[in-house]
Amino acid sequence: MNILTCEGVTKVYGSGDNRVTALAGIDLKVDRGEFVAIIGASGSGKSTLLHILGCVDKPTGGRVTVEGTDLAGLKLTQAAIFRRRKVGLVYQFYNLIPTLTVKRNILMPLTLDKRKPDEAYFEEVVKSLGLAGRLEALPNQLSGGQQQRVAIARSLIYRPALLLADE
């Protein structure tokens, strides 16, 4: 079963002389458990595609479905909830909240959903990412690699159907 399907996805910015086509007719199918890497030159549309696949932005044309849900049909609030529950996003810049501890940053998606964490799974995630001893640290007390691992843990903590990582 396809967990992700892209059909003819296009993204255009601007109009007239300022029109820029970032994506043109992208077709992609990804099965559950499959690993796919999108590579290309700087400015080739990789991050734009990631934002569309992650329900952060909408395509100008075409269709994207995740687990059978057509992302274009989601209103802003629905998209935010869908993204939080179904799509793990790890950005090139970690987007950690500087005033929250590592633990609270990791648990943020569950907190927003008013869900209790599965403590055993939480321990498994932080241990596997080497963060067990840093849970009370603030992001500015971590190395860049540790901050990236916190962002990965935050994306994994709610067991998303799809994990997307930008660089």
What are these regions (language model features)?
Residues 2-167:
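ABC family nucleotide-binding domain
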